[in-house]
Amino acid sequence: MQPRRLVLLGIVALVSLSVVPVASQNASSTTTGAAGTSWTPPRTPDGHPDLQGIWDFRTVTPMERPKEFADKEVLTAEEAAEYERRMVASRDADANRDKEASRGIVNGTPVTEDVALAYNDFWWDRGTRVVGSRRTSLVSNPPDGRIPPLTPEAAKRLAARDVARERPAEGPEDRSVGERCILGFNSGPPMAPGGYNQNVQIVQAPGYVVIVNEMIHNARIVPLDDRPHGNLPQWVGTSRGRWEGDTLVVDTRNFLGETSLRGSSSSLHLIERFTRVDADTLLYEFTVDDPTTWTKPWTAQLPMVRTDDQIFEYACHEGNYGMTNLLLGARSVEKDAAAGGRKSSR
């Protein structure tokens, strides 16, 4: 991640020039705003709601409902303030520097410390507030706010993946797509809060919507002309959009198996819904359906807040020696193991 600066994406610049948002003079469709009041969204020249702008989806609200809230769906204002205070304190990387926390398996060895001291709290940008609805989880269905159980097939698949990650990496293909800077953490799809780079820019042009994620500077170009999905798997699948009233619906399938949302497979089918509910709020909802991974589909809601900030220029592998050193470390582990074997055979 590098200092904030304006990103000029060619495709975005081109489509931006062709769209001038206007407020509809005769719009008959209204949306229920965040405060429960009727609100008419501004519209683009082709008559659709104007979703354009940069939207911030930072929040401390977790994906799944914490057990401490049990059947509580919505927090009171006082409970939300206390939860925010606790979450901000617990995530302070400087204050919690000395606390051991598992960081997974690296080259076959469990890691419990940030030995490189790579990320102090300056670099994190997780957010400090719960979502505006004060829901206890982003998951809205099932009603318990929890992601459904894995299927037996998925449990075996994930266990095998964990075993494979315990051995030293033979090449970059053995590392995650995040470490390889192919896909990034919160950008999805579906989008979900993460550690930083939590903005998304939406640009509309006749027949297209472009979704530009700050993380990994990924841009999804979504056609709205009813074209078929085809059958070519891609990292972020193939997205096709349509309007249902004032809601933009994006249907995505044909994911590569390596993409993996929480252990999902290439059977993943994703439906995203974008609804502008007031001048400063874009309600983002997504439904995940993968019968080879979860026992039933699940849905999450993530209200996004309009921001006047610019998009970070995200740099991942430029000047990054982490992957090279990781693979060098793996070769060192193998060398030490081979030397130990020779000694024991004497």
Model-predicted segments: where are they?
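PEST-like low-complexity, intrinsically disordered acidic/proline/serine-rich tracts
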Residues: Q2-R346
